[in-house]
Amino acid sequence: MVKETKLYEVLNVDVTASQAELKKAYRKLALKYHPDKNPNAGDKFKEISRAYEILADEEKRATYDRFGEEGLQGGGADGGMSADDLFASFFGGGMFGGGMPRGPRKGKDLVHTIKVTLEDLYRGKTTKLALQKKVICPKCSGRGGKEGSVKSCASCNGSGVKFITRAMGPMIQRMQMTCPDCNGAGETIRDEDRCKECDGAKVISQRKILTVHVEKGMHNGQKIVFKEEGEQAPGIIPGDVIFVIDQKEHPRFKRSGDHLFYEAHVDLLTALAGGQIVVEHLDDRWLTIPIIPGECIRPNELKVLPGQGMLSQRHHQPGNLYIRFHVDFPEPNFATPEQLALLEKALPPRKIESAPKNAHTEECVLATVDPTEKVRIDNNVDPTTATSMDEDEDEEGGHPGVQCAQQ
């Protein structure tokens, strides 16, 4: 007597149904409720497929008959093939014109990084890289042995796995393990029939040289793909070999998209009276850039050299080179009073600021900020709090105070 009949009811069969009757019932219901034919019956189709997968397996059926669905918990009943895979294996695929039979699966991609400089990305670069990979054995054509010598493993019926059932209290646990007779290969070859080149492994290791072209204008993180140059194995499509560009940080230029950014320092005289800056570009050119007298370059001002950026892979025009100017002021007391008087005549008149009439005024003197305090302020640390903490540390530090004498 069975504990539960739900799965039998799903297939509309008796609990004593034979495998042929189960198969016939599943075929009829699967065709009726397949989502390609009946789009609103997806859940029903999955329920039918699950019921058939369990009852078609003698071990699972015996466990279900004895303990019900509770006995299948942890036993892999829900870890089998999907409803679509079960349907495809049963009918061969291509039903209802909806799906084509599945082709061979694709192997794993091999991903490597290729380190480049910004100069490489500006000028382009070609490099050769050696790759060690598995390829189909040319001597046995991937069979692993003499033709006709490879047999399906009788112990696991060619699946490469075996199932063991354990009783754990009132529960039955069904576990999967690699078949020890074929080491998971699903096939066996007699030692005398093994291929001498690959020793039955079907593949051998081979060194391959790939020529990698880093095109002008490529970006950090961009991928260079070699289709199906990955490792080979019988029955699969080789994966791709993918090189990911890893750009080293540049000491002079920053890149954003197709644009370059450069930080230029000019002295105050050049900023006011004109002069010239020189920029070493990424292709060994030196750009001479005049600063027009009276142009008055301001601190942190941004200028642009159109078309001097990176070559664009998407547009015909290259990007721009943006130059951020930093004006370096002279040291204190750099000029005599007479020179300052001449400077005052040359510059626009100073703006005179004054307090409101009859306001209380107090004259103050500017002082230089302590370098340590400046760092704290730049890092948004309250200098008052920081100073207080330093004083506390000094008090706790190794300067003993007055101690009481023991009586």
UniProtKB/Swiss-Prot annotation:
Residues 405-407 form a propeptide. The keyword Protein transport applies. The modification Cysteine methyl ester is found at residue 404. It comes from the Eukaryota. Keywords: Chaperone, Cytoplasm, Lipoprotein, Metal-binding, Methylation, Nucleus, Prenylation, Protein transport, Repeat, Transport, Zinc, Zinc-finger. Zn(2+) 2 binds at residues 153, 156, 179, 182. InterPro entries: DnaJ, DnaJ_C, DnaJ_domain, DnaJ_domain_CS, DNJA1/2-like, HSP40/DnaJ_pept-bd, HSP_DnaJ_Cys-rich_dom, HSP_DnaJ_Cys-rich_dom_sf. CXXCXGXG motif repeats lie at residues 137-144, 153-160, 179-186, 195-202. GO terms for cellular component: cytoplasm; cytosol; nucleolar peripheral inclusion body; nucleus; protein aggregate center. A zinc finger (CR-type) spans 124-207. Coiled coil: none annotated. Residues 375-407 are annotated as: Disordered. It is found in: Cytoplasm; Nucleus. GO terms for biological process: cellular response to heat; cytoplasm protein quality control; protein aggregate center assembly; protein refolding; protein transport. Substrate binds at residues 110, 129-131, 209-210, 241-243. GO terms for molecular function: ATP binding; Hsp70 protein binding; protein sequestering activity; protein-folding chaperone binding; unfolded protein binding; zinc ion binding. The record marks 329 as: Involved in dimerization. Zn(2+) 1 binds at residues 137, 140, 195, 198. A lipid is attached at residue 404 (S-farnesyl cysteine). Homodimer. Probably involved in mitochondrial protein import. Plays a role in microtubule cytoskeleton organization. This is Mitochondrial protein import protein mas5. It comes from Schizosaccharomyces pombe (strain 972 / ATCC 24843) (Fission yeast). The lineage of its organism: Eukaryota, Fungi, Dikarya, Ascomycota, Taphrinomycotina.
